[in-house]
Amino acid sequence: AQTWHWVDATDACRELDRVVRPGGRVVLVWNNLDVSHPWILRLARIMHSGDIQRPGFLPEVHAPWRITRELRTGWVQHLRTQQLHDLMATRSYWLKSGPAVRERMTENLRWYLHDRLEFHEGQLLAIPYRTDAFVLER
């Protein structure tokens, strides 16, 4: 589901209907930075961390599929400041960017973490995430 926003939901639901056995279920899961924390919202923007879903969002699904259950929860990942740079380098925006954009992103993240927020090099940070999961059944 982390890629659900890249597919046509109508076509994807049709294909799921074709490949999922009768009585089978599909689970769509989003793990996103919890941008309800202002510093995380800015971090997500600097890192170009993709879609920001509003709390309570529902993914687009089409017949014969329907959402029968939801799980919404939060969790924390502990990362050192350098690991946030490593995480940024996994984002699609970073991967498709050239050296000049990557250099600017790296400097922006360095500035934000160390100058603006005054975190120390190597400091362990609690990064809040939000997980939204949806069970689809026919």
Describe the residue ranges of each PLM region.
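Conserved Class I S-adenosyl-L-methionine
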Residues: 60-138
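Conserved catalytic/acceptor-binding region of the Class I
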Residues: 11-79
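Generic hydrophobic/packing signal
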Residues: 3, 24-27, 136
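A short SAM/SAH-binding and catalytic strip from SAM-dependent methyltransferases
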Residues: 1-10
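Alpha-helical structural elements of signaling/regulatory helical domains
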Residues: 8, 53, 97-101
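Short, flexible active-site-adjacent loop segments at beta-strand->alpha-helix junctions, enriched
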Residues: 4, 32-34, 90
